[in-house]
Amino acid sequence: MAPLSRGLELLDSAVSYALAGAAPGTAQLLRRPTPCPGWDLATLLDHVSDSIGVLHQAVTAGCATASAAPPGHPWPGPDPVARLHGQAAGLLDACAAAGPAERRVAIWDRELTASMVAVTGAIEITVHGWDISVACGARRPVPPGLAAVLLPIAPLLITPGTRPGLFADPVRLPGPASLGDQLVAFLGRQPRPPAAPGPDGT
């Protein structure tokens, strides 16, 4: 569990990865489907914004009971990608200015250390960063170093009891896979694009 003490570092890495995946996002892409069933890119970006709001509220107020958009850095107009940049910067600033990593933070009916909240946020932002990159047509792999730290932690935070409503069931991979693909699969995504049909259409 030593990596939990690196919560802010992991959150920073996750945010950088997600924002890089969102960089190609334009208004023309907002209605594109994502790996999240029934969600287009606009809905996914709104969800990530809400999640950042909850994390920001937890870090600054010591508790979070509902989705709340944080007062992050300003962004120009209604561009959801620019909004995400501003909110992510505000969240990282708030985490850096907050108290000890061991302090207790309440999120809904759970009480976690601040560092565990940051790691939980890193997992969610990482997987949604992957979702965003797929929707934008890039399918950026999760950085190996980030995946190596998050992969053994994820099953401790995402259990059979906490998974429903948050993540789909793990996807079984047919063979050897990178750490990033293993993480994405554990979080209910198919990390590899469907195989192209053969000459006979199969």
Residue ranges, per PLM feature:
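Glycine-rich loop at the start of a catalytic domain that most often binds anionic cofactors/ligands
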Residues: H47-V48
